[in-house]
Amino acid sequence: MDLHNIREDYSKQELSQANCHADPIQQFEQWLEEAITAKANEPTAMNVATVLDGKPTSRIVLLKEVNPNGFVFFTNYQSRKGQAIEQNPYVALTFFWAELERSVRIEGRIEKISAEQSDNYFASRPYTSRVGAWASNQSQVLSSKSELVAKAALIAAKHPLHVPRPPHWGGYIVLPERIEFWQGRPSRLHDRICYRLVEGAWHKERLSP
């Protein structure tokens, strides 16, 4: 399959160091809001990269909160990503908003949020999603799809109204140490503005594309 001629030339916007916020979290919130306004497809979807036994792996997860401390998502703690995080508590996140020709890369340490925070979010989820969190042994081999459906039915019968949060399911927060904003530009002369956390303060610099 020859893919040599598949390419795009980016020209929608530019990114200057002077116009970026001093705080990268604020800059991210601005870009995320613009992605939502532009009706970007799945604007909160992000690639979460982890390392397990020295081997990288990645998957798409939905961002559920951004606050001054970092970026929050929820998952099964016993999943492959959960095992990787337990072994190596450093991850990388990547957002890509094709409609705006933009990308954001985030690197940092990850830790669990409080049980209370996880309880509150879990209670806000649709009933079927709460049932699914119990039914799925995430990342484990299934003999068939019917096995999963049957298990979900048993959980629903056991908890027809209130579904408690599984102890193996909850939230993580990524505490950023490096955040890079990428804006596509013509002739591959892209804009890259990088923030690095140095002794508690953010340092902003332009990188070569």
Swiss-Prot record:
Chain positions recorded as substrate binding sites: 7-10, 64, 121, 125, 129, 188-190
Enzyme class: oxidoreductase
Cofactor dependency: FMN
Cofactor note: Binds 1 FMN per subunit.
A Gene Ontology molecular function term of the record: pyridoxamine phosphate oxidase activity
Annotated Pfam families: PNP_phzG_C, PNPOx_N
Pathway the protein contributes to: Cofactor metabolism; pyridoxal 5'-phosphate salvage; pyridoxal 5'-phosphate from pyridoxamine 5'-phosphate: step 1/1; Cofactor metabolism; pyridoxal 5'-phosphate salvage; pyridoxal 5'-phosphate from pyridoxine 5'-phosphate: step 1/1
Reaction it catalyzes: pyridoxamine 5'-phosphate + O2 + H2O = pyridoxal 5'-phosphate + H2O2 + NH4(+); pyridoxine 5'-phosphate + O2 = pyridoxal 5'-phosphate + H2O2
GO annotation (BP), single: pyridoxine biosynthetic process
Domain of life: Bacteria
Keywords attached to this entry: Flavoprotein, FMN, Oxidoreductase, Pyridoxine biosynthesis
InterPro entries according to UniProt: Pyridox_Oxase, Pyridox_Oxase_CS, Pyridox_Oxase_N, Pyridoxamine_oxidase_dimer_C, Split_barrel_FMN-bd
Binding site for FMN: 59-64, 74-75, 80-81, 138-139, 182, 192
Enzyme Commission identifier(s): 1.4.3.5
Subunit structure: Homodimer.
Family, per entry: Belongs to the pyridoxamine 5'-phosphate oxidase family.
Its job: Catalyzes the oxidation of either pyridoxine 5'-phosphate (PNP) or pyridoxamine 5'-phosphate (PMP) into pyridoxal 5'-phosphate (PLP).
The protein's name in its UniProt record: Pyridoxine/pyridoxamine 5'-phosphate oxidase
Annotated organism of origin: Actinobacillus pleuropneumoniae serotype 5b (strain L20)
Record gene name: pdxH
